[in-house]
Design a protein with these regions (language model features):
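Conserved RNA-binding domains used in RNP assembly and mRNA/RNA metabolism
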Residues: 2-98
Length: 98
C-alpha cells in the first residue's frame, strides 16, 4: 500500500493547501461548488457557494463548468469528514439560479 505524505510541517493545518481554491465538492448526499475561504476544525467555509442539484454530464461539469441545475446560496460550510471527493473548479462560480 502506498502512503502519501501531505505535509511534514507540524504547524501546517490539515487541508490548508485548499485555502483560497475554488472546488467542486461531492458528499454522499449533495454537491457544492465554492471558494474555500477558511478551514476551521473539520469544516471548509465556502464563499460564493452553490448547491448543485444536477451536475449533468460530469466531464462537461468539471472541464467546461457546465451545470444543469444549480442554486447559489452565498456562504456555506461543509464538514470535511463528509467529503467523498473534490475537484478543482477552474471556472467562474455560478451567480444565478439555473
Amino acid at each position: 500500500m502506498k502512503t502519501v505524505i501531505v505535509s511534514t510541517d507540524s504547524n501546517t493545518p490539515p487541508l490548508a493547501e485548499f485555502l483560497n481554491q475554488k472546488l467542486f465538492i461531492r458528499t454522499l448526499t449533495y454537491h457544492l461548488v465554492g471558494k474555500v475561504v477558511a478551514i476551521t476544525d473539520n469544516f471548509f467555509e465556502l464563499e460564493d457557494a452553490s448547491w448543485v442539484a444536477d451536475s449533468g454530464r460530469f466531464m462537461q461539469a468539471i472541464k467546461e463548468g457546465k451545470l444543469n441545475e444549480v442554486e447559489p446560496v452565498g456562504r456555506a460550510w461543509v464538514n470535511t469528514d463528509a467529503i467523498t471527493d473534490m475537484f478543482p473548479w477552474d471556472h467562474d462560480l455560478p451567480k444565478t439560479q439555473k
